[in-house]
A protein has these predicted regions:
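A structural "flexibility-hinge" signal
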Residues: 1-182
Length: 182
């Protein structure tokens, strides 16, 4: 995160806060999109693309370190955000900006970096778990966001459950609105 912070000209705390806000917003929008067959089919098709096979995760250290954020990653992220947020990515960037204190441009760049990482992670999970249908991808996203039937929190849910109350949803809403739960 240090390199990404330097590349944006922002401090690490703001960059970390922006990533913490961006990831659940992206995952939540993807989960929402999978509630209809068209959205689920579109996401499954995108995850079949070699570009989203998980290989980006091998470069995560250098991407977050700032040395590998190139125009290709930003362009891929921009395209992903357009699909995931249905053209409303400025609203999402505003929420990330409000949560992190970053300016809109920096918040948008964080979203553009986070989106291909999320897609790479999902693509890798899809292949490893042999997910072939909309129910499977919805279950995967639900598990990541804490919507699974399991009693134990998923790893990402534990990370995203900022107040430790067992519910990620209130934390995601708080992240999106820039407020903290009292």
């Amino acid at each position: 995160i240090n390199g990404t912070s330097k590349q944006l000209g922002k401090n690490e705390q703001q960059t970390t806060s922006a990533l913490t806000a961006a990831l659940p917003l992206i995952l939540g929008a993807m989960k929402n999109n999978t509630t209809n067959k068209t959205g689920a089919t579109g996401l499954l098709g995108a995850l079949d693309n070699q570009q989203h096979d998980g290989s980006i995760l091998d470069n995560l250290g250098s991407i977050l370190g700032g040395s590998s954020i190139d125009d290709k990653i930003l362009a891929d992220g921009d395209g992903i955000l357009g699909h995931v947020f249905n053209g409303k990515q400025q609203n999402v960037a505003h929420a990330v900006s409000a949560k992190s204190g970053l300016d809109m441009s920096s918040a948008m760049n964080i979203l553009k970096v986070a989106a291909p990482i999320v897609m790479g992670f999902l693509g890798k999970e899809k292949r490893q778990k042999n997910i072939q249908d909309s129910n499977g991808i919805g279950d995967l996203l639900g598990g990541l966001l804490g919507g699974s039937a399991k009693n134990e929190q998923s790893m990402i849910e534990k990370i995203l459950d900022a107040d430790g109350d067992g519910s990620v949803i209130d934390d995601i809403i708080g992240m999106a609105s820039g407020s903290k739960k009292k």
